[in-house]
Amino acid sequence: MKRVTIVVPCYNEAERLDTERFASFSDDRYDVRFLFVNDGSTDETQRVLEGLRNRASERVEVLCLPKNRGKAEAVRQGIVRAFSSECDYVGFWDADLATPLSTIPEFCDFLDSRLDIEAVIGSRVKLLGRQVERSTSRHYAGRVFATTAAFVLDIQVYDTQCGAKLFRATPEWARIFSAPFSTRWIFDIEIIARLRELRRGTSQPEAKDVIYEYPLMVWRDVEGSKVRLKDFVRSIADMARIWKRYGRGKGPKKIGDW
């Protein structure tokens, strides 16, 4: 059985965090360990997380950042911490559980069966027979964003921003997360850009051939999301920054070059 660590970034989630669902899942899945990162919350998030850790101490760890750093840095620090422990797969999951925890074993099974794939990322595609509940405005905003992201990455990816991703715990992925990202929110794009740059000019398969977009069976918009219209506008500017930094890569990066 593979060992899995899932990083869960949390900022002021005291009222929304469904500790019962996390605890119940932990009771059933001894192979999955959760690493919650409290990103400088100003509410009772730390108390709630400590309560969950006390209930499932062997499978729950809490990392507390002294001040708010943004989702990108919270996830990155959690991933770096996860790589310091023994695990086969490492990933991150949104705390609101828009993607249910039952999807984690599906991602693991897929990586088990496809040794050519290095990462599985959730994709919110509304298809018949699937329960993907996304507002119309978010859907169309997402399509604009995804089209822009595909241009920046030169990879036809459908959904970069779903908060459910799982990676093989390899030195290559450790390098990708070794330095802070240049944006606070759309770091998902930068993850793919870094992988693409590491493999550019090498004999390894290209990034587009080792990342699998997994169409989710269930996903739902959760009330209280912290992504606002101004964040969407800012993300377009951030995309330009990513393109400038990675869009004209000339070869594999050295550690620390990010």
Specify the residue positions occupied by each region the protein language model found.
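Hydrophobic helical membrane-anchoring modules
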Residues: 1-4, 178-258
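Short beta-strand/loop segment that forms part of the nucleotide-sugar
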Residues: 8, 22, 30-41, 63-65
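Short, well-formed alpha-helical segments that are part of the catalytic scaffolds
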Residues: 12-27
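Donor nucleotide-sugar binding loop of glycosyltransferases
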Residues: 13-16, 41, 71, 100
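Acidic helix N-cap motif at the loop->helix transition within catalytic regions
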Residues: 15-19, 43-52
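A conserved acidic beta->alpha catalytic loop
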Residues: 38-47, 97
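Acceptor/aglycone-binding surface of glycosyltransferases and processive sugar-polymer synthases
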Residues: 65-84, 89, 101-185, 222-225
